[in-house]
Amino acid sequence: RAEDAGGTGGVLPLTRAASAVSARMFALAGRLRGGRPLHPRGLVFDATLHLHGASRPWGVPFLDDTAELRGMARLSRAAGLPPPLPDVLGLALRWEQPADEAGVAELLLASTGQGLLGRHLLRPRMRWVPAFYGSLLPYAVDGRRLFLGAVARPTRTVPADDAALARAADERPI
């Protein structure tokens, strides 16, 4: 899902300052934790990305075209809190680009809200599915900004713990 954020896509001084503070905090957390500061554990699955195309052209095949891409998905809990405590959930996607765009692409998403304000806020959840996973910050595309997201369709409920996720994936695609 792509959503226009408006604006020119320029980097604001506040954004640069927030990025610098975040980088220092994550480096410190990683040293204190002795490993990854966020998403320390997760499960990796084969994945199929179903791209539906945007409602208006962006000039980028990934956004404009209807396609089915094969790749990998990693689902993880951000803080690594034990279930059943809610945690911010992460969805990391990796896929091979089509032949004319050689290389590997990655998209990192987290459980967020969907509204005008909510898309900027992390949302701790207790279930992998149903859920919305979005980009916290917009991507710059041809002078415009947009938010990307993925919807875990509500065909069933899957609690946010690794064992339940593994069982659900063994039964059928998530």
Question: Regions from the language model: what does each represent?
Answer:
Residues 1-174:
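Active-site-adjacent core segments of small-molecule enzymes
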